[in-house]
Amino acid sequence: MGTPELKIILEFSAGAELLFGNIKRRELTLDGNQKWTISNLLKWMHANILTERPELFLQEDTVRPGILVLINDTDWELLGELDYELQPNDNVLFISTLHGG
């Protein structure tokens, strides 16, 4: 048997995609041997796929105010925010509410 995998979908909307190489949807296969929380995922994203101005996406160890996070269409605040443990086929959507004038 191979290494267990955790497959999830990341989506970026309303300008958040500009920080990730203008890619709006990304299917990820993560190492299923480890526990993946949103906190771990954000660190992985910063190290691997965040291409532009990380200060517009992250503030310390979390997303900055103005970035909405939905997990399977549910506000992450209802699911434990950074402590939420990712499940197979989760859809994590990041929506930027930060817009210039």
UniProtKB/Swiss-Prot annotation:
**1-thioglycine (modified residue): where?**
101
What Gene3D superfamilies does the annotation carry? 3.10.20.30
Q: Enumerate the Gene Ontology biological process terms.
A: negative regulation of JNK cascade; protein urmylation; tRNA thio-modification; tRNA wobble uridine modification
Record's comment on post-translational modification: C-terminal thiocarboxylation occurs in 2 steps, it is first acyl-adenylated (-COAMP) via the hesA/moeB/thiF part of the MOCS3 homolog, then thiocarboxylated (-COSH) via the rhodanese domain of the MOCS3 homolog.
Keywords in alphabetical order: Cytoplasm, Isopeptide bond, tRNA processing, Ubl conjugation pathway
Where on this protein does the Glycyl lysine isopeptide (Gly-Lys) (interchain with K-? in acceptor proteins) crosslink form?
Answer: 101
A Pfam family cross-referenced in the UniProt record is Urm1
Specify the pathway: tRNA modification; 5-methoxycarbonylmethyl-2-thiouridine-tRNA biosynthesis
Q: Which Gene Ontology terms of cellular component type are present? A: cytosol
Subcellular locations according to the entry = Cytoplasm
* InterPro entries (alphabetical): Beta-grasp_dom_sf, Mopterin_synth/thiamin_S_b, Urm1
Q: Which family does it belong to?
A: Belongs to the URM1 family.
Summary of the function given for this chain in its UniProt record:
Acts as a sulfur carrier required for 2-thiolation of mcm(5)S(2)U at tRNA wobble positions of cytosolic tRNA(Lys), tRNA(Glu) and tRNA(Gln). Serves as sulfur donor in tRNA 2-thiolation reaction by being thiocarboxylated (-COSH) at its C-terminus by MOCS3. The sulfur is then transferred to tRNA to form 2-thiolation of mcm(5)S(2)U. Also acts as a ubiquitin-like protein (UBL) that is covalently conjugated via an isopeptide bond to lysine residues of target proteins such as Prx2/Jafrac1, Ciao1, Eip71CD and GILT1.
Task: Report quaternary structure and partners.
Answer: Interacts with cer.
Q: What is this protein called?
A: Ubiquitin-related modifier 1 homolog
Organism, scientific name: Drosophila simulans (Fruit fly)
